[in-house]
Amino acid sequence: MKSIYITGYMGAGKTTIGKALSKELHMDVVDTDQKIEENQEKAILDIFAEEGEMAFREYESEMLRSLPVRNAIITTGGGIIEREENRKWMKENGIVVYLYCDPHVIAERLREDTTRPLFQKKDIDAFVTKFESRRAYYEEAHIHIDTTNKSVKQIMNELKEKINE
C-alpha cells in the first residue's frame, strides 16, 4: 500500500489520527516534526528561534523525501503544504489526507500549548488568516475529513471508508 500522508493545520488531529490509523492498518507511523527534532537535536521552537522558518521548511522538505513511500503513515507539520514541491511529492507518492477543523475550535484546543511557534494566543485573527492562506493547498489532498467536534472513532470510520473507495 502507498504511504498515507496526513495533513492539516496545527491542532486538527494529525498526530492522534495518525497513531490510530497506524494501529488499525498495522503500519508504522512517522511524524515529520519529531524526525526533524531528532535529526537537528533541538526542538522545533528552537529551530524557529535560532535558524528561522525558512531553515525549518528546508529541513521539512528534506525529511519528506527521506521517508518511506510504501506502508507508512506520515503525519506532517501543518506548513509542509506551503511548498509546491512537497504537495506534488506527497500526491505522487502516496494518499494525501486533509484533516480540516474549524480554526476557532483549534484555537481553543491550543490555548494552553506553548510548543507551537506559529500560534500566538493573543492574535486569533492572525491565526485564522494563516489558516485561510493555507486552505487551498490543503484542499489539493485526495481525501478530506472534517474533524470539527468529532470523536477519534467517528473520524477513523470516515477515513477508513474513504481510503477503501
UniProtKB/Swiss-Prot annotation:
GO terms for biological process: amino acid biosynthetic process; aromatic amino acid family biosynthetic process; chorismate biosynthetic process. GO terms for molecular function: ATP binding; magnesium ion binding; shikimate kinase activity. Its main location: cytoplasm. It comes from the Bacteria. Its cofactor is Mg(2+). It catalyses: shikimate + ATP = 3-phosphoshikimate + ADP + H(+). Pfam families: SKI. Catalyzes the specific phosphorylation of the 3-hydroxyl group of shikimic acid using ATP as a cosubstrate. Monomer. This is Shikimate kinase. It comes from Bacillus cereus (strain AH820).
